[in-house]
UniProtKB/Swiss-Prot annotation:
One of its GO terms (cellular component) is ribonucleoprotein complex. This is Small ribosomal subunit protein uS10. Involved in the binding of tRNA to the ribosomes. The gene is rpsJ. GO terms for molecular function: structural constituent of ribosome; tRNA binding. Keywords: Ribonucleoprotein, Ribosomal protein. Belongs to the universal ribosomal protein uS10 family. Part of the 30S ribosomal subunit.
């Protein structure tokens, strides 16, 4: 598979889980002999939700909640069949969304 490239995008709400998953992927790929670029941190997406604290009135009293989505990008250059097999067998937490292109 010379000249090929695999791009892995990771998304998670917890930055520690996404960093541990990225580290595990990089270790697995380097062990199989392919080259790795990354993990590259992409901009964190921040969603803020404003909610009125009281159920009926007092509109001036509000509460803000935020959700941060952390993203990482990993490129695997010149993957071998052994690399692809190792990536399929890797065990990652359920809180990390993995998109492979």
């Amino acid at each position: 598979m010379a000249g090929q490239k695999i791009r892995i995008r990771l998304k998670a709400y917890d930055h520690e889980a996404i960093d541990a998953s990225a580290r595990k992927i990089v270790e697995t790929v380097t062990r199989t002999g392919a080259r790795v670029v990354g993990p590259v941190p992409l901009p964190t997406e921040k969603n803020v939700y404003c909610v009125i604290r009281s159920p009926h009135k007092y509109k001036d009293s509000r509460e803000h909640f935020e959700m941060r989505t952390h993203k990482r990008l990993i490129d695997i250059l010149d993957p071998t069949p052994k690399t692809v097999d190792a990536l399929m067998r890797i065990d990652l937490p359920a809180s990390v969304d993995v998109n492979i292109q």
